[in-house]
Amino acid sequence: MTILAEIVKYKQSLLQNGYYQDKLNTLKSVKIQNKKSFINAIEKERKLAIIAEIKSKSPTVNDLPERDLSQQISDYEKYGANAVSILTDEKYFGGSFERLQALTTKTTLPVLCKDFIIDPLQIDVAKQAGASMILLIVNILSDKQLKDLYNYAISQNLEVLVEVHDRHELERVYKVNAKLIGVNNRDLKRFVTNVEHTNTILENKKPNHYYISESGIHDASDVRKILHSGIDGLLIGEALMRCDNLSEFLPQLKMQKVKS
């Protein structure tokens, strides 16, 4: 069983055991009318838009430094991030909906709930906790699930980042006409990354969508490797959580977009 399949099985058990219903019943609703739109930010930006991530660990990384997360969010916004991603999976990534709820009020930037969503109830919890965006991972969803969850999230006034790992999944996303598409550079079987995976997947990309490269981006040289694929932005977690000088590092990543 792959790590991803294991995580999905875990999410199914949480749904069956009432975990998400309990969250919906106990989390106070967070009002996020002041949140900016990430798509609007992309449309206005001549430079790459950055989704800066808050994470504590992952199945492959356990030694991320502890940070003052409120300060981290503040620094992300101060030094040019266009959105913040917050992991809400507790078991594998050390996140929580309570963390999302606490941090979303610290910024006017759009906030992405990054989790493994397979049911509308998870979307309800994300929204109640203060997310303005959600992630849908094509690899773990059927075509019907993808369409239904995407349309439900849009109906809840949430922006949706739809994540693909190969060209076949990209074609599936085009069928639901998702505006915002994430290209994950991680091999789902081995959980290793290759940033140039973005170039391969986007060779024959369609116009009128926005493309975000995710995972494996550690420095400006990685960004230069994929800039000419025509990406509109980056999602970066580990490199930012390890960085002790965001004031220099983050602006270096915001390179001028190259439309291919």
Curated annotation (Swiss-Prot):
Pathway per the UniProt entry: Amino-acid biosynthesis; L-tryptophan biosynthesis; L-tryptophan from chorismate: step 4/5
A molecular-function term among this protein's GO annotations: phosphoribosylanthranilate isomerase activity
Catalysed transformations (reactions): 1-(2-carboxyphenylamino)-1-deoxy-D-ribulose 5-phosphate + H(+) = (1S,2R)-1-C-(indol-3-yl)glycerol 3-phosphate + CO2 + H2O
Matching InterPro entries: Aldolase_TIM, Indole-3-glycerol_P_synth, Indole-3-glycerol_P_synth_dom, Indole-3-GlycerolPSynthase_CS, RibuloseP-bd_barrel
Gene Ontology BP terms: L-tryptophan biosynthetic process
Pfam families reported in the protein's UniProt record: IGPS (PF00218)
Keyword annotations from UniProtKB, A to Z: Amino-acid biosynthesis, Aromatic amino acid biosynthesis, Decarboxylase, Lyase, Tryptophan biosynthesis
EC number from the UniProt entry: 4.1.1.48
Domain of life, source organism: Bacteria
SUPFAM superfamilies xref list: Ribulose-phoshate binding barrel (SSF51366)
UniProt KW Amino-acid biosynthesis keyword: yes
CDD domains with a match to the protein in the record: IGPS
Protein family per UniProt: Belongs to the TrpC family.
Protein name: Indole-3-glycerol phosphate synthase
Species the sequence originates in: Staphylococcus aureus (strain bovine RF122 / ET3-1)
